[in-house]
A protein has these predicted regions:
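Short S/T/G/P-rich N-terminal loop/turn motif that feeds into the first structured element of a domain
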Residues: 1-93, 100-108, 124-189
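A common structural junction motif
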Residues: 113-119, 125
Length: 189
């Protein structure tokens, strides 16, 4: 890994500078969505021989202490069960981390324990996207929407079922159009 970019992705330097230099008056929480694709076998840059998987190496990385030190919290962590739609990348894991400020995201990366454990992430990751987000207000359901009768569903949920989380990550080719809901998503409203 060089000082600019890890082997598993390209750093958007402009966004990094924005995160680091946002004035305290304008700063606030940021949610970082992490899409992770692991190497089949971990590949350490120091040349050590290993048979552990990329996911196992990333589990060694686990930056819980660094996150806690800057006031961040993991709000979602899950292994991908199914990928319904997307390009050629089939993601293995998704994490969403809420940082109290944009600067705290940068501060975490300067912590010695983070830098020491990062070698495991570098060894484990084939590719990752880290996407800074701000939550949107969910649309209110139409007033005439009737609740679903689970008796009409072939495989209704049971009290033993866990939650299902669906994450839809959009990439807009036309950044100016990114503030508008794509026409094909109007049906979701």
């Amino acid at each position: 890994m060089n000082s600019s970019n890890p082997r598993y992705g390209l750093v958007d330097r402009e966004y990094g500078i924005q995160l680091a230099t946002t004035s305290p008056a304008d700063d606030g929480p940021v949610w970082m969505v992490n899409l992770m694709k692991y190497r089949e076998v971990a590949d350490y840059v120091d040349g050590r021989k290993t048979t552990i998987s990329g996911q196992a190496a990333d589990d060694l990385y686990s930056p819980i202490d660094s996150l806690t030190a800057v006031g961040a919290e993991i709000v979602f962590l899950g292994d991908v069960d199914q990928q319904l739609l997307g390009d050629n990348t089939v993601w293995d894991r998704i994490a969403v981390v809420k940082y109290p400020t944009r600067k705290s995201f940068i501060d975490m990366q300067a912590r010695p324990e983070f830098q020491e454990s990062h070698k495991h992430k570098d060894a484990g990751m084939d590719k990752t996207f880290v996407i800074g987000c701000q939550p949107l207000q969910a649309a209110e359901p139409p007033p005439d929407l009737e609740p679903l009768d689970w008796a009409d569903v072939p495989h209704p949920p049971t009290k033993d079922d866990g939650p299902v989380v669906v994450m839809h990550v959009l990439r807009f080719e036309d950044v100016d159009a990114g503030v508008q809901t794509p026409a094909y998503m109007e049906a979701y409203k």
